[in-house]
Amino acid sequence: VDGFLPPELIYSNPGFLRPCRGLPVAGQVLLHLYGADLVRSGGGQWRCFADRTQSASGAGYAHENRKVVSRVLPDEIREASVRSPSPFFRALRSILESLAPQGREHPLMVLLTPGPLHATYFEHAYLARHLGIPLVEGADLTVRDLRVCLKTLEGLQPVDVVLRRVDDSFCDPLELRAESVLGVPGLVQAARAGHVTVANALGSGLLESPAFLAFLPAVCRHLLDEDLKLPSVPTWWCGEAEGLRYVTAHLERLVVKPAFGRRRGRIWFGHQLSAADKTRLLELIAARPQEFVGQECVMPSSAPVWTSAGFERRSVLLRAYVATNGTNPVVLPGGLARVAASEDDPWVSMQGGAGSKDTWVLRSGDDDGEESLAAAPAQGPTDRRLTGLPSRAADSLFWLGRYAERLEQHLRVLRCVLGQLASDSSPETSDRDDRLGHLVAGIGLLPVTPEPSVAPPADGEPGPPETADDVPDLTRKVLDWVYRFDGPGSIPDLMGRIRQNAAAVRDRLSGDTWQVLDRLVPQGEVPQARRSIAHALGLVQGLILNLAAFNGLAMENMTRGPGWRFLDCGRRLERGFSMTSLMTAAAFVPGAPTPLLEVILDIADSGMTHRQRYFASARWPGVVEVLVRDVSNPRALAFQLSALRNHLEALQDEFRVGVDDRWSALIEGIQGRLLSAEFAPEVPDREGFDRQTLIALMETCAQGLAGLSDDLTHRYFSHTHPRVS
């Protein structure tokens, strides 16, 4: 800037991205969302100590804080006339719409996130949902003919505006950091061609260096002929001789920080350094002075925080936000107030456990017009174009449905077994435990060993499943499975898979749905003294009810679009697998069938249906009719096939591609076999039922469902990574 900035400050900064130099800028605005980290000194003066120009995270947290506080203190907020943050976000959406190249009438905007593992992913999903734009990862986007496109089930859709939450150097592995897996190959080239606008502009991370604060007052006076309205914390860059001399001479009064890069985690407070640490720091500065800055140590003001010990003082910082398209800047009323994790913490770090507070700005007489102007959207909601479902989101919804149904099935089996074990002991207890042990081992829930007493199957016949070893000790095994087992297929494992897939589509799930999913977390270590059948039953029952709430919200609140269909396809496939496994395991259990069949009906929540229909004890023909053939029973295998067929036909009509005719024929064939199968044995016996026919039929159904799952994956989720089934 006319010689006010040393060249070394620019060219030695890793944030200077040479490929981004000269990129076209919509409206000549590089920063569309800006954040300023502010500190209030003991004298009450506010100063800026850091600029956030990459992505200015935290605005979504501020909005969420207001939502929470509004529910807790609604009267206080209304009586105090606190300004709402909502107009800021409506203005932000309007600003993003105005950035579309060539003034497109219905621009497609996306929020680019590093993914669910990022520390601020919650805010990414929250902000995308609140702005009404798709939340995407780098793998969801591709560049075709210099156009950034969103991969959807309908095909590639051109993207006009990218609101990024990925650091600029990671946004394009072709021209920036080659090792990045977070960005979009070709994004810089598409931006250079003027076909997409990235907000904030690629390369804007350069300005996050605290070294610029040392020169900002002079630059402001040169460009605007005025002093900074909001002064910065006095800063000295050690890359200049004068700054280096001042920092080394006044180290005990300063805070020393890295000047460049992502090494902000290490901060040295001069007054806390020992003599040895001070010497070591001076050696580091002397070796590479351009990589360090010194800032005046301004101790933040404090705010009261309620803890288990009562009210405590905590240091507080404020991040303020501005959104602009170059003409009408809009300031977020309030901002994100952050409080230190402990009373003696000299600074505030969210990574170090700091908390946040809602910040109130009171309304004045001339605020209404400003908020109305900011709230006015560029287009009416009826004019906004619908965005297709990204393939990755469809994949995550599909597996969310599968894992949720798998967990529910496991829990239903455990609940039934625990209920049986909790019943009064009798001479038949040993036989009961033996049947239950064979059943749960056949399903695959318990550690198993081959049962030596079972004769090998004849040629062409299916072999028996493995059975639980040490069946008389069934109670101990079931309790161990509930409390201790955390391997594949366990309760904690399935909970983790559910939350992982739900997190990938967090912007597509309602707040009520997330409240239910938040309860699906492992309970932690349960003391041995508390482990009992009664306690395990309560734990399992609570999880079943939470899953029922999740399923109910999905059925009642989700629009019947492709997302819901893939979620329900996953549920129907998994329920079909579970039913074939349950019926096969039951068919292999020796002994009198009636008690076991009643257990199966209980697991499938179909005991009442059977009693109302047959008015008799459970027998194989009636159970097969209820759990296999009944197209009106939501737990029956035939119902799952019918639902899958309806979903596949709807998807085929919507996308004009879809399932081969062979899969439609397969479903029809399985349905026909289910309805026409004859289970009368060739040689009359006491049961009057041919179990081998049922076992073969269930095996055929399971193979067909597996092939159908693979075909869905290949056709709709081909660009995603394969999942472990």
Q: PLM features: residue spans?
A:
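Alpha-helical transmembrane segments and their helix-helix packing motifs
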Residues: 1-28, 41-43, 53-109, 117-124, ...
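Domain-scale recognition of functional cores that engage charged ligands
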Residues: 1-354, 358-374, 380, 391
